[in-house]
């Protein structure tokens, strides 16, 4: 799956940037005959609305019709990251330092795959960050995270 998302990221990153949006990240869910491609966009101006998503979706659909980065049928979903924003890159962890996050690792660490805590210090050199939980502090490798989302504290 990483190859598919890498290929798509390379294909659309500049297009989205030229449209004055930030490509937050991509999720590709292969599901039998029909897959889902989720593209998360943002902007630092006013946030992302339905019209923004529609505009980007049309542009990406045109590109995908020509380039065909995904074989078989798929649904393209373009959306804002929302308040429980997904985290994809090291820069996201740096940007949301001190925020609550829930995440799932690719493989267990000390018998656990699911973690919840506060994003602590990010170490750029080895691509890790500290996750401060209620009872412990864990150092996690960003490359080994399957899925991570901010958690809103009301």
UniProtKB/Swiss-Prot annotation:
InterPro entries: Ribosome_maturation_RimP (IPR003728), RimP_C (IPR028998), RimP_C_sf (IPR036847), RimP_N (IPR028989), RimP_N_sf (IPR035956)
UniProt cross-references to SUPFAM superfamilies, sorted A to Z: YhbC-like, C-terminal domain, YhbC-like, N-terminal domain
Pfam families reported in the protein's UniProt record: DUF150_C, RimP_N
Biological process according to GO: ribosomal small subunit assembly; translation
CDD domains: YlxS_C (cd01734)
Keyword Lipoprotein: no
Highest rank taxon of the organism: Bacteria
Main location: cytoplasm
Cellular localisation: Cytoplasm
Keywords: Cytoplasm, Ribosome biogenesis
Any one of the GO CC terms: cytosol
Function field: Required for maturation of 30S ribosomal subunits.
NCBIfam families (alphabetical): PRK00092.1-1 (NF000927)
Family the UniProt entry places it in: Belongs to the RimP family.
Annotated protein name in UniProt: Ribosome maturation factor RimP
Species name: Ruthia magnifica subsp. Calyptogena magnifica
């Amino acid at each position: 799956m990483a190859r598919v998302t890498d290929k798509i990221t390379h294909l659309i990153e500049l297009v989205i940037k030229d449209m004055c949006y930030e490509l937050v990240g991509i999720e590709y869910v292969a599901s039998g005959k029909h897959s889902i491609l989720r593209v998360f966009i943002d902007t630092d101006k006013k946030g992302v609305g339905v019209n923004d998503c529609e505009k980007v979706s049309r542009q990406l659909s045109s590109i995908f019709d020509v380039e065909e980065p995904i074989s078989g049928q798929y649904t393209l979903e373009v959306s804002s990251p929302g308040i429980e924003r997904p985290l994809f890159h090291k820069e996201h962890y740096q940007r949301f330092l001190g925020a609550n996050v829930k995440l799932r690792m690719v493989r267990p660490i000390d018998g656990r795959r699911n973690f919840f805590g506060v994003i602590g210090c990010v170490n750029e050199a080895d691509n890790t960050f500290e996750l401060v939980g209620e009872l412990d502090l864990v150092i996690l490798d960003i490359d080994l995270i399957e899925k991570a989302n901010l958690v809103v504290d009301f």
